Amino acid sequence: GFVGRISPEKGLEDVAELSARTGRVVRVWGMMQDEAYWHRVAIDHPDARLDYRGFLPTDELQAEIGRCAALVMTPKWVEAFGNVAIEAMATGVPVLTYDRGGPAEIVVDGVTGFVVPADDVDALADAVERIDQIDRAMCRQRVDAEYSSLAMADRVVTWVDEVVDASNAVVDA
């Protein structure tokens, strides 16, 4: 599956090329921001099997993502974080992403998905063929350990403790 705005910076043309090469249907969810771009991708990749599902409420989207073999992220720019990667992994879905920006930092290559060189559709296609090697439970465990509310709260507490300790060291000096 693919989740994101339908716009050039999300790299949907690479997803279409991936679909054409692998023969797999890729479900696409997101706001249709650039309809001309969507049509151009379809024309340029006539063998792609993209199934546009529209923009869904979060709970429905998570249920849909959970039925995917993988989530594909092909950003053409440096994404700051990549909430979609967290949402997919929380449902046990591995993520295939380019080595660019936040998603590449979230995905543990070979454990919760695959991180491939940016703009390398051949590497994405290879990753698709290996997707069954990923243990979906590990995807969920990674999100629980690193991105759950409890994990984030623990990091904030640690940070505050470090700031207080540093402040005390300055006062004592």
Q: Where does each model-flagged region fall?
A:
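Conserved donor-binding/catalytic core segment of Leloir-type glycosyltransferases
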Residues: G1-W29
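Short hydrophobic beta-strand element within catalytic cores of glycosyltransferases
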Residues: P94-T97
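Nucleotide-activated donor-binding/catalytic signature segment of Leloir-type glycosyltransferases, i.e.
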Residues: V28-G30, W38-D59, A63
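Short alpha-helical segment that forms part of, or immediately flanks, the ligand-binding pocket
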Residues: Q62, A85-A90, A104-E105, V111
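Nucleotide-sugar-dependent
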Residues: P75-G82, A104-E105
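A short alpha->beta transition loop at the rim of the catalytic pocket in nucleotide-sugar-dependent
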Residues: A69, G92
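A charged, aromatic-enriched C-terminal amphipathic alpha-helix characteristic of glycosyltransferases
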Residues: Q133-A169
